[in-house]
């Protein structure tokens, strides 16, 4: 019996999707544009990084070649030295969205059949009846925001008023999301979670995918910063996923990072949410060391997206990629005979792009492990090919979307 490890590099797209024009994202290319900026000297930051993007281990696994399949060109400095060490290709999303749950569910074999509901980019953004109900049921003096906004910017802009009035900051984006930011101490963390549970119920009628608690600390004088106590309240997947099939077969499942939230804590097994990317990867590899045969580990590394993509931070994104690349040898060393590892992404978030939202992109598919023969797999017509492949590798019965590529 075999084991499997899926690592999602949240937002590391490799070039605009065929339907990117429908989303205003034609020409977006998260990885390619980061590599270009770094090659031009525009990805430098004193004390953090400098020079071309250095991802030698990912290039060796075929990342540059996967990107070339999606965008038509190998990103600067990502040409592999020697033959690739793994299976490489790129995948197109079939779900009508560019959000985290849609991408992850499709990776797990469940493309979303209908688009999510979204709030318009107007002021106010939320229906008046939704706001009235939230204020009444949450016993609030009102809300702040009620608009599309990047999370860090709106907390900086409205944090002082929030402390003065006690009104939580409610905002949204191009994603199907209702976000509530509040001060952990002045408003209360548990009160924020309770309010988000109310919002989750109220948002169901609008087909909103996620309600997110965004706690922060600080003061107007010292500045505000978000904490690691974010909580996502997502709609449950509308059908069976790879995780459901693994659970039904009695297999061990370990979910690291945001995976538990993304799948609404259904069939997610042992959940570990240790914090930033480095801690999540360490937790995943520690879990792999004791994972029984037939088990599955699903890891999300969210900092690419939240800390750098949305903030349009090219040097930070590049440094995060380089930090992950440096740990590829550790991942390879942790794989036992019969293990399969897959590195992929769920959408794009081009830090050189306009605005602050995700970008509709293709994603890399890198599969490797002892005994996995290196070869190209070209363009996969759905992210679900990943779930189908992992299911086949684990010997799970599969009636989901997708076609195995191994």
Swiss-Prot record:
Give the EC number: 5.4.2.7
Localization: Cytoplasm
Provide the catalytic activity annotation.
Answer: 2-deoxy-alpha-D-ribose 1-phosphate = 2-deoxy-D-ribose 5-phosphate; alpha-D-ribose 1-phosphate = D-ribose 5-phosphate
Q: What class of enzyme is it?
A: isomerase
Give the UniProt keywords, A-Z: Cytoplasm, Isomerase, Manganese, Metal-binding
SUPFAM superfamilies for the chain: Alkaline phosphatase-like, DeoB insert domain-like
Record's GO cellular component terms = cytosol
Q: Which cofactor names does the annotation list?
A: Mn(2+)
The pathway that the record names for this protein is: Carbohydrate degradation; 2-deoxy-D-ribose 1-phosphate degradation; D-glyceraldehyde 3-phosphate and acetaldehyde from 2-deoxy-alpha-D-ribose 1-phosphate: step 1/2
**Record's cofactor remark:** Binds 2 manganese ions.
Keyword Metal-binding in the entry? The reply is yes
A GO molecular-function annotation: manganese ion binding
**Positions bound to Mn(2+) 1:** 10, 346-347
Signal peptide location in the record? none
Q: Which CDD domains match?
A: PPM
Q: Does the keyword Isomerase apply?
A: yes
Tell me which residues bind Mn(2+) 2: 305, 310, 358
| Major localisation | cytoplasm
The family database entries (NCBIfam families) matched by this protein are listed as: deoB, PRK05362.1
Q: Which family does it belong to?
A: Belongs to the phosphopentomutase family.
Give the protein's biological function: Isomerase that catalyzes the conversion of deoxy-ribose 1-phosphate (dRib-1-P) and ribose 1-phosphate (Rib-1-P) to deoxy-ribose 5-phosphate (dRib-5-P) and ribose 5-phosphate (Rib-5-P), respectively.
- Name of this chain's protein: Phosphopentomutase
State the organism named in the record. Answer: Methylobacterium radiotolerans (strain ATCC 27329 / DSM 1819 / JCM 2831 / NBRC 15690 / NCIMB 10815 / 0-1)
């Amino acid at each position: 019996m075999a084991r499997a490890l899926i690592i999602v590099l949240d937002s590391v797209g490799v070039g605009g999707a065929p339907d990117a024009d429908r989303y205003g994202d034609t020409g977006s290319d998260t990885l390619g544009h980061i590599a270009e900026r770094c090659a031009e000297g525009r990805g430098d930051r004193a004390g953090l990084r400098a020079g071309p993007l250095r991802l030698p281990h990912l290039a060796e696994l075929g990342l540059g070649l996967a990107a070339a399949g999606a965008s038509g060109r190998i990103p600067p400095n990502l040409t592999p030295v020697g033959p690739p060490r793994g299976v490489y290709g790129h995948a197109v999303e079939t779900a009508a969205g560019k959000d985290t749950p849609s991408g992850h569910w499709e990776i797990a074999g469940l493309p979303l059949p209908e688009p999510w509901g979204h709030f318009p980019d107007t002021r106010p953004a939320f229906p008046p009846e939704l706001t009235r109900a939230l204020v009444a049921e949450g016993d609030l003096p009102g809300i702040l925001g009620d608009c599309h906004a990047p999370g860090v910017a709106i907390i900086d802009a409205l944090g002082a008023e929030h402390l003065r009035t006690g009104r939580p900051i409610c905002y949204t984006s191009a994603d199907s999301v209702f976000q509530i930011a509040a001060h952990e101490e002045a408003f209360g963390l548990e009160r924020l979670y309770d309010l988000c549970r109310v919002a989750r119920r109220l948002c169901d009628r609008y087909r909103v995918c996620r309600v997110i608690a965004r706690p922060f600390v600080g003061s107007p004088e010292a500045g505000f910063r978000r904490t690691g106590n974010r909580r996502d309240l997502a709609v449950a997947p509308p059908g069976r996923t790879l995780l459901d099939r693994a659970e039904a077969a009695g297999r061990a499942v370990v979910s690291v990072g945001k995976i538990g939230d993304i799948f609404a804590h259904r069939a997610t097994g042992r959940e570990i949410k240790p914090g930033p990317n480095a801690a999540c990867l360490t937790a995943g590899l520690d879990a792999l060391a004791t994972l029984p045969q037939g088990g599955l580990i699903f890891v999300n590394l969210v900092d690419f997206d939240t800390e750098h993509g949305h903030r349009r931070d090219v040097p930070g994104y590049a440094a995060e990629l380089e930090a992950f690349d440096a740990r590829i040898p550790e991942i390879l060393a942790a794989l036992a005979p019969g293990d399969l590892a897959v590195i992929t992404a769920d959408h794009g978030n081009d830090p050189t792009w306009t605005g602050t939202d995700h970008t509709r992109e293709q994603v890399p598919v890198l599969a490797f492990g002892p005994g996995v023969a290196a070869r190209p797999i070209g363009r996969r017509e759905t992210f679900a090919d990943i779930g189908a492949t992992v299911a086949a590798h684990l010997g799970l019965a599969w009636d989901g979307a997708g076609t195995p590529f191994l």
